[in-house]
Amino acid sequence: MTYRLKKEISKIFILFKEEFNMAENKYAGTQTEKNLQEAFAGESQARNKYTYFASVAKKEGYEQMAAIFLKTADNEKEHAKMWFKELAGIGDTKANLAAAAEGENFEWTDMYEDFAKTAEEEGFPALAAKFRMVGAIEKQHEERYRALLKNIETAQVFEKSEVKVWECRNCGHIVVGTKAPSVCPVCSHPQSYFEVREENY
C-alpha cells in the first residue's frame, strides 16, 4: 500500500468516525496503526491472490489444491477482518455505505487518474486507458453506494413513493405496492428479504 493511499484511508476513517460516531481507533498516529494497516492490506491481497490461484488449479484439474487455496483465502479474509476491526473500520450499514462511497470517490477522482497519467508518461498508453476505464466503473460504484445511503436516510429501502414490484429474495414471491410486506406471506422470511424487482433480460 502506497503512502498516499494509506494517508487517504486514514482521512476517510477520521471523517466517518466523527460523522457517524464510529468507534475510535485507539492506535491512531502510532507505528502499531501503520502495522495494522499493512497487515490488513497484506491479508486482503493474499485472500484475493489465493482465490485467483484456486481458479487456475480448478481449471488444471487439481480440485484438492483449489479447495486448499479457497480454504486459506477464507482464513486470510478473517485475519484481514480482525485487523480492520482493530482499526475501527467497520461501522453500521449507513456508515459503511458512506465510507464505501468515499473510497470509490477517491479511486475514480484521484487514484486511477494519477495512475493513468503516470502510465502515459512512462509509455504505457493501453494501461493508462484501462486505468481510466476502471475509474469510470468506480464512479458508478460511488453513485450506487450514495443512492443506497440515500434510501436509508429517507426511509425508502422497503417503502417507495411509487408503486413497485417487490420480490422476496428467498422464495420469489411477488408483491405489487408502495411497500414490501413486513413478513413474506409464502415463506415467512422478514421484510429485509424483499427488494424492488429488476428485470434486465
Each predicted region: which residue ranges?
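Short, Lys/Arg-enriched N-terminal segments with co-localized hydrophobic residues
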Residues: 1-21
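Non-heme di-metal
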Residues: 22-201
